[in-house]
Amino acid sequence: MNIDKFTAHAKSVIANHQSLAIKNDHQQILPLHLLSSLLSEETGIIQALINNIGGNINLLKDQVQLELNKIPKIQVDGGGQIYYSAEDLKVLEKSSSIAKDSGDSFVTIERIFEALTYDNTIAGKILTNNGINSKKLATAILHLRKGKKADTESAENNYDALKRYGRDVTELAENGKLDPIIGRDEEIRRAVQVLSRRMKNNPVLIGAPGVGKTAIIEGLAQRIFSKDVPETLINCRIIELDIGALIAGAQYRGEFEKRLKAVLSEIKESSGEIILFIDELHLLVGTGKVDGAMDASNLLKPMLARGELHCIGATTLDEYRKYIEKDAALARRFQPVYVGEPSVEDTISILRGIKEKYELHHAVRISDSAIVAAATLSNRYITDRYLPDKAIDLIDEACSRMKIELSSKPEELDELDRRIIQIKIELAALKKENDEHSKKKITSLTEELKKLESKSYDMNTKWQAEKSKLQQAQKLKEELEQARIDLERAERDANLAKASELKYGIIPEIMNKLQEAENMDNKGLLKEIVSESDIASIISRITGIPIDTMLSSERERLLVIEQKLCESVIGQDEAIKGVSDAVRRSRSGIQDINRPLGSFLFLGPTGVGKTELTKALAGFLFDDRNALLRIDMSEYMEKHSISRLIGAPPGYIGYDQGGVLTESVRRRPYQVILFDEVEKAHLDIFNIMLQILDEGRLTDSQGITVDFKNTIIVLTSNLGAEILVNQKEGEDTYKVRDEVMQYVRAVFKPEFLNRLDEIILFHRLNRNNIHDIVKIQLGSLKKILLQQNIILEFDESALNYLAEKGYDPSFGARPLKRLIQREIQNNLAKMILAGEISSGNTVKIRREKEELSINIID
């Protein structure tokens, strides 16, 4: 016996049976150990042989283990010597002899298994008693190998290669494990047309990720199963090639090629009845190419050209262009079938078709409004992915979320139980006290506890009943699904009696029971129907865009948005109204969906509230005044600085980092973008804004389209500020506007100005405005001091003093801020550090003659 003539798997079995004997403290290595090792081998070849003969591998394993337990254990200090029994060596010799007689160059595991049938010990008897003899086994091996000889050390890897390295899609269709395919008739028809050709009958499905390329293959498999295809394809089977399994473990040079050749050989022998489906077709180019070896695509080319291999590929347009088109010889052997993104209407039909599968899996119900919302909202708000994939993901996640909620305790009941635990803890603590107040408290808490426990018991009973009803409905859905699969099978096999029983008896009965089980009280504790609001909530979490159903409180808030913004911005009613209208349009869903929510050019002198209004708007929308992207346009005075906004071009440093503007909007699609002091930027920068303002999108340096449709864009400028500063009381507003617009038109191109929603003038602040701003500024200071437990008070004289001294029509409110810092904050800081003002003090500010006085009240 030459151990080198055994395959790698056979050597592994021999090593394992030796380890088994040592592990069990047996002195001899017996054929029984060899049989046990064979039954546990990982390739599945022995199991396939036993199943073919009609044996039961689990029964064999139990019998072998029973006999192994009977062998006496011998334990010797320091480790005893273990040796091969004569019978074991005889079996291995016999396996070599069988392999040689069969024309094999190497001894494989099935030859060792065959040799065991000639064994006269207990191992051979177990096989004989289970109906496994040498004659049956030889026939099964011949069927398994399909006439192939074991001529390599990895011969077992080439047996039944299609089953090992592929997935039978047609079999999945037969077992009802594929989702129904709605639409895509044209693409399936085109694929069938190419497959029916005499030569080069290999379609390649090309389309964006998520449009349903693999679904077309599943649809074709279902049509083959239902015989809804031309005669040439009726007996075909679609096998999906697993390239990962093909490559995995191919450690020796040439092993990958042998595996692939074994797959191709089986396909060739099938006489055109096997259609090979290769997902991610571009992976074939270069796969297996090491040190001059041929890659997978070169192995396929001859068979593809001769029409011996029916192959369907699937890849994206970018990868087809990058890998397949570069290899012209490979590209010409495939016929492209372009798969486009389905429309929203088609997506709704697809979702309705797969609805039952998701309801069955998640044990929930999906409303039709949820399906429509998933298609329309995903198309509108998730712009970097494709239909129907993104819509299906929304349905799946919404169902998953509801399933988790159904399996956990209802929130109302959970809060009740927590309150009961809290009361019990309080009672335990109060029982240690003897005073009268504690006794009264114990009495009141005990009464409350009784009421809550009674309520909890009732709710718990109701919850369990509802849960039981849902579980019953789920079981009925599973039975209904299985009955429908059985009906299809019965109709296909022409078993009319069974088909009639299922169609007119069993299925209607299950449906009636299911209808009764689903008639749950809408006011129950459990909600099992996925609605439109659930889909909107999922999109809000994914994108950050608040499109979930507005609460009545928010509706009221949006109607008074002007009042909220006026609390921060004084004297700019026209600007506030324009911005407020834009927000209301967006939140009510009636704005143009192909443009940003609003685009404004704020014109006015410094310090009148242009930037402040933008911050106030961000604060209103996000409850955070700093939740806006602020881009200071004075940093973009050079032409080349455009690359900072959209990313550096290929070949430059920072190409892979993205742009300041595009990356921010990609990560947070719903935000306020402030381009501050736009007149200072290079004029070429405004050219990239044209498509943002008009189409609501921008392509960055990497070719990724960024969606700006959910942003509010604000541009601020000081152009024409001199005119607005010198504007007299009661002067014609239209005349002033025309003069300012002359300055604006001299700087900005008409196509840029024409794309803005509104150009808003910020007028200079008057004394009354400054008086109101003083209140706001001191109010902010009051809040800061309150954090240190210091109360700040000021009278009307102090307000008038600050308004008079802080008023400068040319500089707006900014001098006022500096005045408050100089006159109040500096003095307060000194007094706090000196210990004159401490926590709990009240500080009163009033005017005394021509200055402010700060008085401390304990």
Swiss-Prot record:
SUPFAM superfamilies: Double Clp-N motif, P-loop containing nucleoside triphosphate hydrolases. The keyword Repeat applies. GO terms for biological process: cellular response to heat; protein refolding. GO terms for cellular component: cytoplasm. The keyword Repeat applies. Residues 554-764 are annotated as: NBD2. Residues 392-523 form a coiled coil. One of its GO terms (molecular function) is ATP binding. Keywords: ATP-binding, Chaperone, Coiled coil, Cytoplasm, Nucleotide-binding, Repeat, Stress response. It comes from the Bacteria. Part of a stress-induced multi-chaperone system, it is involved in the recovery of the cell from heat-induced damage, in cooperation with DnaK, DnaJ and GrpE. Acts before DnaK, in the processing of protein aggregates. Protein binding stimulates the ATPase activity; ATP hydrolysis unfolds the denatured protein aggregates, which probably helps expose new hydrophobic binding sites on the surface of ClpB-bound aggregates, contributing to the solubilization and refolding of denatured protein aggregates by DnaK. This is Chaperone protein ClpB.
